[in-house]
């Protein structure tokens, strides 16, 4: 049994045994094929019926991939599991574009952050903290909030000349990268689609 996500390369499914059953559990930004609770329930139900269950996710399951939540559910049901780490898109996509996230001369720190902040921290505090924190920010799920993110970062101290890259379809043959600065990337963002 393979429960797979939207962001995996579908060609990898061809390596599964012909008898494998596949379940799509992807989450589009505007539509979830299954609520997370249903995915969790399916993993537990299939495992308790004696099936070997693979939860196949793109990137690293513990970096904005709900892998921690899913592992917790399995542990709470005493279901043994193994985590196979992946390479998060915040590392893979910039590398594929030839952009290092750290560089001895420019950036000695990097943070992986989400534009969908549910930590309870005030939005202004969150972006002020990031504006004055690590040199490199890899922002996940931020396309729809790009103008607001750029405004908040510059408002709280990041230079409008800070280099920015937008990467679409990272590490695929359709990857597209647009570069600019915090001050002009919003105007260039239309080039990504």
Show which residues each predicted segment covers.
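Short secondary-structure boundary/capping segments
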Residues: 13-14, 45, 102-103, 128-130, ...
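A contiguous loop/helix-start segment that scaffolds small-molecule binding in enzyme catalytic cores
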Residues: 38, 48-54, 109, 117-193
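Class I S-adenosyl-L-methionine
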Residues: 1-87, 186-187
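Cofactor-binding loop segments of dinucleotide-utilizing enzymes, especially the Rossmann-like FAD-
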Residues: 5-7, 115, 169
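Class I SAM-dependent methyltransferase SAM-binding "motif I" and its flanking Rossmann-like core
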Residues: 58-133, 176-184
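Hydrophobic packing residues within well-ordered alpha-helices of enzyme cores
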Residues: 12, 74, 93-94, 149, ...
């Amino acid at each position: 049994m393979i429960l797979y996500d939207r962001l995996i390369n579908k060609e990898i499914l061809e390596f599964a045994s012909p008898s494998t059953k596949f379940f799509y559990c992807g989450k589009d930004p505007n539509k979830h094929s299954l609520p997370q609770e249903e995915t969790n329930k399916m993993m537990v139900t299939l495992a308790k019926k004696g099936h070997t269950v693979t939860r196949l996710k793109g990137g690293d399951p513990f970096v904005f991939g709900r892998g921690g939540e899913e592992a917790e559910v399995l542990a709470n049901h005493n279901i043994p599991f193994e985590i196979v780490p992946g390479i998060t898109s915040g590392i893979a996509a910039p590398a594929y574009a030839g952009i290092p996230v750290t560089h001895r001369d420019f950036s000695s720190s990097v943070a992986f952050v989400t534009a969908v902040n549910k930590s309870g921290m005030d939005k202004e505090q969150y972006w002020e903290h990031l504006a004055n924190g690590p040199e490199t920010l890899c922002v996940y799920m931020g396309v729809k909030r790009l103008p607001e993110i750029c405004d908040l970062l510059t408002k709280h101290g990041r230079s409008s000349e800070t280099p920015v890259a937008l990467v679409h379809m990272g590490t695929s043959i359709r990857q597209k990268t647009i570069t600019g600065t915090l001050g002009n990337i919003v105007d260039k963002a239309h080039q990504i689609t």
